């Protein structure tokens, strides 16, 4: 899986950028706020999520791992694909989105093109317990930092291996709840084992 891309920015368009890394130009889809930080001809690094489908492999880029993880979490919601997840993050930054989900703010969520009242309510229902409010207290600091660092790459790897985003999220959350200090490789092995038993 491609977890990040670093290199020269060759092109910045309305919905994507092209970044050259080791002689290869990667097209990375991104939100306007992320694209606004890039300048053609300069060096840049984006945290990425690679979504693999039967007929495509698409990179989505973010300025930080928290936003990337939130993107992957949005994909676990029924009816939310990569385009709608990116549209959501284009309208709301990570902190505002967490707060809206925590507060059940349907009005804020329906400001996203493509999300109606029912879709917003489903988002709140499915994600409120998964996503805490911005700055909310939760697990001990060390465990929280570790879970944050491990969760995104594990979920991304599982999605890349063909598991549904929701399955990947649930399996990873179970593993990290049982083993908060697990490393990325250990958590991935445990999640694969868990998913293998459920098949």
UniProtKB/Swiss-Prot annotation:
Biological process terms in GO annotation: DNA recombination; DNA repair
Superkingdom, taxonomy of origin: Bacteria
Keywords on record: Cytoplasm, DNA damage, DNA recombination, DNA repair, DNA-binding
Region (Domain II): 64-142
Record-linked CDD domains: UBA_RuvA_C
Membrane-spanning segments: none
Disulfide bridge positions per record: none
Pfam families given in the database record: HHH_5, RuvA_C, RuvA_N
Function: The RuvA-RuvB-RuvC complex processes Holliday junction (HJ) DNA during genetic recombination and DNA repair, while the RuvA-RuvB complex plays an important role in the rescue of blocked DNA replication forks via replication fork reversal (RFR). RuvA specifically binds to HJ cruciform DNA, conferring on it an open structure. The RuvB hexamer acts as an ATP-dependent pump, pulling dsDNA into and through the RuvAB complex. HJ branch migration allows RuvC to scan DNA until it finds its consensus sequence, where it cleaves and resolves the cruciform DNA.
HAMAP family: DNA_HJ_migration_RuvA (MF_00031)
Assembly notes: Homotetramer. Forms an RuvA(8)-RuvB(12)-Holliday junction (HJ) complex. HJ DNA is sandwiched between 2 RuvA tetramers; dsDNA enters through RuvA and exits via RuvB. An RuvB hexamer assembles on each DNA strand where it exits the tetramer. Each RuvB hexamer is contacted by two RuvA subunits (via domain III) on 2 adjacent RuvB subunits; this complex drives branch migration. In the full resolvosome a probable DNA-RuvA(4)-RuvB(12)-RuvC(2) complex forms which resolves the HJ.
Record text about domains: Has three domains with a flexible linker between the domains II and III and assumes an 'L' shape. Domain III is highly mobile and contacts RuvB.
Protein name: Holliday junction branch migration complex subunit RuvA
Species the sequence originates in: Mycolicibacterium paratuberculosis (strain ATCC BAA-968 / K-10) (Mycobacterium paratuberculosis)
Taxonomic lineage: Bacteria, Bacillati, Actinomycetota, Actinomycetes, Mycobacteriales
Gene designation: ruvA
